[in-house]
Amino acid sequence: MGSATKPARKKFRVAVSGSTIDGREISGEHLKAAAKNYDPTVYGARVNVEHLISPFPNSDLCAMGDVTALSAEDITEGPLSGRTALYAEIEPTDRMKKLTDEGKKIYSSIELHPQFSLNGKPYIMGLAMTDTPASLGTERLKFA
């Protein structure tokens, strides 16, 4: 019997509509459209470190995982009630799991392109692991 196991995947809140900590605005409609339009067979969003990705596979800044699915939901309770949340299902590499287990780069930051080349609509191009998320309400990344 082989040791093949399914990769660990988990869904996290990666962005919330409204003002960011640095004064930018995330549109709820953009988050909903990005979730609706996301198709990793068309363009798969990779997880990176601090919005940097190295062309070298053994670099500390190599890809850390993949976004396998997106969904958007309205928040109905708590201090962020009335806003839209974007959730990402992430398939992490072992390195990503190790970093988050160590408490490093435990939050996320989306890379949202407002006009994707396929259809001119919002699309998530990547997702960064960070210690300083711009969006309010991001969930801690934890896979174990």
Language model: regions and residue ranges:
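N-terminal, leucine/charged-rich tether regions that mediate assembly and partner docking
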Residues: 1-144
